[in-house]
């Protein structure tokens, strides 16, 4: 993976995904403060972020590296009309890697074509969020003890939620079975379903969250975005795809609830105290997964 661009999950082999997860587990168990010594990473966030940006910056510094960058594209020369290609040419001439989030789909792939150093996609529009998927895989294996043959439900906004697109693609390499629970207007995109069909991966489209909970090893919740509905329709959908603690009474003992965060109303606060809640530990795992990725991309051996 040395000097590899990290743009989308389909660019990874199963073996590479396992390598990142294994390395993350090792770094969580035995921290290393020297893996990015003398390395400089650019953190280029053209779109707001809390967890992704801060966990990347934490990862770089804990590995002994240095970081430069910006948290808002409005404060850069992009506001003056500079193209992304020109910006990346310049930024990559200063640094050893570029971590980038951008609101436009395909922006990370474009950046990689003009960068002199590896580009790591921190999210491009509603398209891909590969490093979120890596921390999700790490959290899933940490809680389930394996990645192979799991049953996973995705619930909420499956159309615009880039995290579920990437994670479905990744877990398909491990023979997962899926439940897709969403309103019809926010269903999993056809291209993801077609990819799963081609691989012979089983999935079921469902409209009842409570009905699928007893069947799954992992429940992956996402936020239904208020701005996509009128108020009456949103209130109806919101209640239908919100998780409460009482809905977990028939869940498998080891089942874990994940969420890319931020949550709004789709997971009630009373779920936090249940043994199934794992979304805060999942967010914490973002540092270890991103440490692993940076170490593998910027070192020939780790």
Swiss-Prot record:
InterPro entries: Asp/Orn_carbamoyltranf_P-bd, Asp/Orn_carbamoylTrfase, Asp/Orn_carbamoylTrfase_sf, Asp_carbamoyltransf, Asp_carbamoyltransf_Asp/Orn-bd
Catalytic activity line of the entry: carbamoyl phosphate + L-aspartate = N-carbamoyl-L-aspartate + phosphate + H(+)
Annotated coiled-coil segments of the chain: none
Binding site for carbamoyl phosphate: 51-52, 101, 129, 132, 261-262
Keyword DNA repair annotated: no
Cellular component, GO, one term: cytosol
UniProt GO MF annotations: amino acid binding; aspartate carbamoyltransferase activity
Gene Ontology process terms (BP): 'de novo' pyrimidine nucleobase biosynthetic process; 'de novo' UMP biosynthetic process; amino acid metabolic process
Keywords noted in UniProt: Pyrimidine biosynthesis, Transferase
Record-listed L-aspartate binding positions: 80, 162, 223
Transferase listed as a keyword: yes
Physiological role: Catalyzes the condensation of carbamoyl phosphate and aspartate to form carbamoyl aspartate and inorganic phosphate, the committed step in the de novo pyrimidine nucleotide biosynthesis pathway.
Record note on quaternary structure: Heterododecamer (2C3:3R2) of six catalytic PyrB chains organized as two trimers (C3), and six regulatory PyrI chains organized as three dimers (R2).
PANTHER family the UniProt entry points to: ASPARTATE CARBAMOYLTRANSFERASE, ORNITHINE CARBAMOYLTRANSFERASE, MITOCHONDRIAL
Name of protein: Aspartate carbamoyltransferase catalytic subunit
Native organism: Chromobacterium violaceum (strain ATCC 12472 / DSM 30191 / JCM 1249 / CCUG 213 / NBRC 12614 / NCIMB 9131 / NCTC 9757 / MK)
């Amino acid at each position: 993976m040395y000097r590899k661009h990290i743009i989308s999950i389909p660019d990874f082999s199963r073996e590479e995904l396992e390598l990142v997860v294994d390395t993350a587990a090792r770094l969580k168990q035995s921290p290393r403060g020297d893996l990015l010594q003398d390395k400089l990473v650019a953190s280029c966030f053209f779109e707001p972020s809390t967890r992704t940006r801060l966990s990347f910056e934490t990862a770089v510094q804990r590995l002994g590296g240095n970081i430069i960058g910006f948290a808002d594209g409005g404060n850069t020369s992009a506001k003056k009309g500079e193209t992304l290609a020109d910006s990346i040419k310049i930024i990559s001439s200063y640094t050893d890697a570029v971590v980038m989030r951008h609101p436009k789909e395909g922006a990370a792939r474009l950046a990689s074509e003009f960068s002199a150093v590896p580009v790591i996609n921190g999210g491009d529009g509603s398209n891909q969020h590969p490093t979120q998927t890596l921390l999700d895989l790490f959290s899933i294996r940490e809680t389930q003890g394996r990645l192979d043959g799991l049953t996973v439900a995705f619930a909420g906004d499956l159309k615009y939620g880039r995290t579920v697109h990437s994670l479905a693609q990744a877990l398909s390499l491990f023979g997962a079975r899926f439940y897709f629970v969403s309103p019809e207007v926010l269903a999993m995109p056809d291209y993801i379903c077609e990819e799963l069909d081609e691989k012979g991966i089983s999935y079921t489209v469902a409209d009842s969250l409570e009905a699928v909970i007893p069947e799954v090893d992992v429940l992956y919740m996402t936020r239904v975005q208020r701005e996509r509905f009128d108020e009456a329709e949103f209130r109806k959908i919101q209640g239908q795809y919100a998780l409460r603690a009482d809905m977990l009474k028939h869940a498998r003992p080891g089942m874990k609830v994940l969420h890319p965060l931020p949550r709004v109303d789709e997971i009630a606060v009373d779920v936090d105290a249940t043994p199934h809640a794992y979304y805060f530990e999942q967010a914490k795992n973002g540092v270890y997964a991103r440490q692993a990725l940076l170490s593998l991309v910027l070192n020939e051996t780790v």
